[in-house]
Amino acid sequence: MRIYIVEDDLSVINILEDIIEAQGLGEICGDCGGEPANLADVLRSKPDVVLVDFFMPVKDGVEFVKELRTVNTTIKCIMISQV
């Protein structure tokens, strides 16, 4: 399973990547590097699943998923938050 991480906090990205790799849950095919999510980058990575931070400063997770759904309805999205 190919996993892309959309998260604005680099420490959370690193933790998620460590857990996913240690547990053998899938292959990390990319992350947004703590920057605002770029839909084109996500699509280019061809993920099966996108982990999406619910609260992000530029575009929140719900907005991102709505945008993703306009061009791809097969990628699974899992909303995450560190609240």
Predicted segments with their positions:
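Acidic, metal-coordinating helix/loop segments flanking the phosphotransfer/catalytic sites
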Residues: D31-V49
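Active-site residues of response regulator receiver
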Residues: D53
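Two-component/phosphorelay signaling modules centered on CheY-like receiver
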Residues: D9-G30
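Acidic catalytic/metal-coordinating carboxylates
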Residues: G34, D60-E63
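Receiver (REC) domain active-site loop signature in two-component systems and cognate sites
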Residues: M56
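Short amphipathic alpha-helix used as the core "switch/output" element in two-component signaling
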Residues: V62-T74
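His-Asp phosphorelay/catalytic-motif detector in bacterial-type signaling
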Residues: K46-D48, N72-K76
